[in-house]
Amino acid sequence: MNQQGTRKQENLKQPVVTKQQALRMLETYFGYTSFRPAQEAPIASLLRNEDVIGIMPTGAGKSICFQIPALCKAGLTIVFSPLISLMKDQVDGLLVQNIPAALINSTLTQAEFNKTMYEVRSGKIKLLYIAPERLGSNFFCNVLRALPIAQVIVDEAHCISEWGHDFRPSYRLIGEWLNSLPKRPIVGAFTATATKYVENDIKKLLGLNHANVYVTGFDRPNLSFAVIRTPKRMDYVVHYVRQHANENGIIYCATRKDVDRVYENLTRAGIKVGHYHGGLSDEVRREMQNAYADDKLQVMVATNAFGMGIDKSNVRYVLHYQMPRNMESYYQEAGRAGRDGAPAECILLYSGQDVQVHKYLIEQSIETPERQAVELRKLQSMIDYCFCSNCLRKYMLNYFGESTVWTTCDNCSSCKGSGDKVNVTKEAKAIFRAIMGTDERYGASMITSIVRGERTDRIMRAGHDALPVFGLLSDVDEKSIKGLIQQFVASGYLRSSTGKYPVLSLTAGAEEVLAGHKEVEEIRQHVSVPSRTSRSTSTTLRGKSSSGSGGLFEHLRQHRKRLAEKAGLRPYLIFPDTVLIDLANLRPTTLGEFGNVKGVGEAKLKKYGLSFLQAIAEYKG
């Protein structure tokens, strides 16, 4: 979807670039013969010297959207990026393709800074990655002001907004700096997740009210989604990771304590596992992140502090040990799976305790009642997702404002029908009558106590023990009733107010049930880990592998790992898994055949072609 802007800016004399020329750049440097559908329009806009906002899901190839224009334009492209590790990975990935790029952040010595700036001023660098914190220095701002800037790119642009899930105050410096320049350059802002609030902040704070806005669909068809409600989360996690022994995964936990618990259990199970949270030293976090990125660890257990700083494309699963606080965070974190476009799994393990933990954190960390109310509404949407009996993918897309013509995706736990439908109309009527009989003045805890027949002081004083529904569900445990209430909210039978003490009220749907016009069903899940052994990665990734290619794929992975260690690079920067899969399937024997593999550009062909051809020839499987 494009919202057309009108402003053009011509600061440097720019060449007219045709689509064919841009495609030649794409094939030469990146090894692809065509743009993805979402890439072509923002690339064309930047080449026409028009401001752009790109809201594109992880894995859609948003970096290409500004890297191709950077190669085509005269002058320098400045890229603002939030994390040092993310900058390094991206610059290393460009350098390995012979694209002149550099970075400036706090890790550089004065000598390294001077050398980099000399190369920039000499026109030897096309893309310069900068941490936005550097804009706090007047000296550095003056240095940048003298450069021939063709375009400025703001990556992870949601960081500029307090409405976003990863607000960084340093991003506010970018807009101020842009306004201070004698001539404003073309600006592109890119992010994987942005609600309308965040999008408006990006426009306002970066001066992009007239930008072309490209919103690519949030759907990631290669990702399967599941919600598992189980009290035995640890057993599930250990079993799952064992079943996926040859695959990379991330397990997110809400607290440091849970990170350590899961890490210790997986370590005892013999898994190559790392852990990452704010309680660890910078050195330990750096070591863990590097080991995971270099494929020395199979799985990383982490708080949400981990992830944005890593550009790892071959993550095959993301497990959430607890429910995240909101859908924005979940989409961002789950989206770290399958960035190479190959199938991956996103599984959320839910417990009612998660809700109380997040409510407490919201109340403790957010001061203003208005902001608390916003966060509590977001939390309720996350809870509704966990109890959604319809398509999870459709729910997620609708949350982000994207409509769908289909009702089922056949690739989520709801659509796959991983459970039995149980009629809970009796329980629903009891709960609805309790809410109606108390004039819709209470929340889930009080209603649960009433239908269970608990003679608390509060209930007795109010006379609620005289209600006809008092004790009607005395044989149902508290946890199950509260779970049903959450499901009824998610299904639209009940409304839950926001605020510190949410109050339940009936909708028209509940009134239909009470009138006997409608029955209510609950999905009772079968909680189990798929009984398959670890998936053959080649079969999983493409579904087109020939017999024996799985062994060759693993052989090529080990070869890539050795090359990466020798060069000091992340393995996936040499070639992503998807390229190795094609190599294992196609088994090229000449450089010409090797160069025809999608994702192999000229620079990588020259650097690694003969080495991989030899590895393929040596394989005896």
Which positions does each model-derived feature cover?
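Short helix-to-turn junction characteristic of helix-turn-helix DNA-binding domains
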Residues: 46, 241, 292, 386, ...
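Helicase motor core with emphasis on the C-terminal RecA-like subdomain
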Residues: 9, 13-16, 20-29, 33, ...
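Short, charged low-complexity linear segments at domain edges
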Residues: 370-400
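The −1 position to Zn-ligating cysteines in a subset of zinc-ribbon hairpins
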Residues: 345, 395, 408-411
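Accessory DNA-binding and partner-docking regions appended to nucleic-acid-acting proteins
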Residues: 1-22, 375-376, 404-621
